[in-house]
């Protein structure tokens, strides 16, 4: 998924925080979902804490606006490819707008011990637009990375927007009014995932409240996803079939190009009537029935063993009581 190519985000040019349409550096950015999850979680926690405290600690919270959060993004750069893997939070002085350098260096050192190949690539924040004060924070990180990136997450919910509310900016030196100034320019990015991230994100996306049942299990979520995919495939096939029937009856004009595409699509599907398919299908079907039968048989055996053990324990206690009473008499 690429970043949205919106118009330029304009800010005060004297602050050096104007955002041009697109970057000209030629770098390729790959963003991992863990970063988006971390930034979203950071914003949600700070917003919830501000709502619970109700003391109006920050001016943003006091004005009814969601508070901004700040942090660093880390990853690797291989040639012209920048891959952002993870992130961590930063402490910002709300009065002076400066970063806590001691906290930043400590966090950087700790992450270096766990991820020795990861470097600080830039920083992140939340909001709908680039602000004038963002360039001040951006310049403060240039002693760690001479060309840091700025990741901006918009926490506002926009149901009509299909793209991710995430924008990545680079800084470029432009001559404005005869003087060189740093400005933010948009950079395109793609979402890159590894197997562990795909499993985690899929689990979070299908997570349901635990009510003692099995609906929230991973198997149920997996089967639900397969069912939705098959249902969608079935609806698309029905649309194609209805269109072909209408074309055959003469209700729709003949489209040879579309017929070639349908023919190519049909050829990709496996031959469902072949003898080998029937043999393999019956073999897997019988194996599944056998596994189900063995599971039921094992469950019944376990239940029977528990019943026998309870019966023996009850019988032994009853025999002991009768034997003790006879010996006493």
Swiss-Prot record:
GO cellular component term, pick one: COP9 signalosome
Entry's Gene Ontology molecular function annotations: metallopeptidase activity
Residue ranges of domain MPN in the record: 44-175
GO biological process, one term: response to iron ion starvation
A Pfam family this chain is assigned to: JAB
Organism domain of life: Eukaryota
CDD domains found in the cross-reference section: MPN_CSN6
Signal peptide (from-to): none
Induction remark: Down-regulated during the early stage of iron deficiency (at protein level).
Subunit structure: Component of the CSN complex, probably composed of CSN1, CSN2, CSN3, CSN4, CSN5, CSN6, CSN7 and CSN8.
Family (UniProt): Belongs to the peptidase M67A family. CSN6 subfamily.
PANTHER family noted in UniProt: COP9 SIGNALOSOME COMPLEX SUBUNIT 6, EUKARYOTIC TRANSLATION INITIATION FACTOR 3 SUBUNIT F-RELATED
Primary role: Component of the COP9 signalosome complex (CSN), a complex involved in various cellular and developmental processes such as photomorphogenesis and response to hormones. The CSN complex is an essential regulator of the ubiquitin (Ubl) conjugation pathway by mediating the deneddylation of the cullin subunits of SCF-type E3 ligase complexes, leading to decrease the Ubl ligase activity of SCF. Involved in early response to iron deficiency.
Protein name (Swiss-Prot/TrEMBL): COP9 signalosome complex subunit 6
Gene label: CSN6
